[in-house]
Amino acid sequence: MDEGFNTFIDLHNAAQFFAGTPYGDTIEANPLHLAATHTTAGEEQPLIANPTEVRDLMWVGYQKPALMLQTLRFEVLGADRFDPAFRDYIRTWAFRHPTPADFFRLMRDASGMELDWFWRDWIYTTARLDQAVDSVSTDSSGHAMVFLSNRGTMILPAELRITYDDGTIESVRLPVEMWNLGPRFSYRLTSAKRVRRVEIDPRHVLPDLRRSNDLWERRP
């Protein structure tokens, strides 16, 4: 995990320091683009694997931990909570030898959020994310109901982008607790306008391995 932390820090620092230069414009601060080619079912190993037994060291040792921290910072905690907690971890454990559990506890206490579900999926398993928009229907009051499913084994918060017939766009963020009762969730829109299109993870920032079910569009 140490090298993954270094990768996370180095990528972001380099992207900011060299911003606006030919080199800076080529830096992929988010290693999400590598996920599809390094997460083959039955081949990927968890981050907690013994380093001497790791087959794909570049992914397990460097890029996946960086992607994990990227996701935690921007999509789970937000930079306003992640950054102070991460700095606190660095100050607290500088020149010492923390274990993964030490990092987990400090991030929980400093951020104020229980993160066991996150560490389980990212570190102890090779869980995969597959969020989907199953369908959209209209209830008796004229409001649209959006039916979502989590078809993978990883859970993460969800972001929806709803496009209405009049061209207006609404963005909705749903917390990870939406999956507490199972892999299906329905969300009732506050607007009664006719829905043209619903997309989950519209910014493509989550490691969703199947994009084909991320979009629902009303048929003409």
Q: Which residue stretches match the model-derived regions?
A:
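Short acidic/polar inter-strand loop motif in beta-rich domains
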Residues: 202-213
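Short, solvent-exposed mixed-charge patches
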Residues: 219-220
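Intrinsically disordered, low-complexity regions enriched in Ser/Pro/Gly/Gln/His and often acidic
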Residues: 111-115, 172, 209
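Hydrophobic alpha-helical and helix-loop surface patches within well-folded domains
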Residues: 1-150
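Histidine-centered catalytic/metal-binding microenvironments
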Residues: 216
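Beta-strand-rich binding/interaction modules
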Residues: 82, 116, 129-132, 136-202
